[in-house]
Amino acid sequence: MKNETKLKKLVGWLDKNNIEYRCPSKEMSKYKRKKRSDLFIPKFVISVRIDDDYTQKWYRAHYDMNPVVIRDTDTPRFLIKKMQNTITRVMVNQQKYYMKEHDKKETKSNR
């Protein structure tokens, strides 16, 4: 199965679950497209890219944006599972951050 088809299945899954996404590379020139992700989910700050020659540099540059790479060996089911795990990890990290901030505010107000 082609990687573009896997990306379309992932987009279908995102639509089904009402998760907003953007496809920034479709509007770009060929040079800029090389450096951009194929799909971006702003709510969870997740970047998705189809595997190619530039992927390693892209991964290092976008490491803080929770990168997900679509490889030739991935099945659509595995890709969706990988996306679910990434979304879950981001949500847990956000919750930890909010709880930490809430604790800071409480200790500050108790002084």
Locate the predicted segments by residue:
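Nucleic-acid endo/exonuclease domains
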Residues: M1-R111
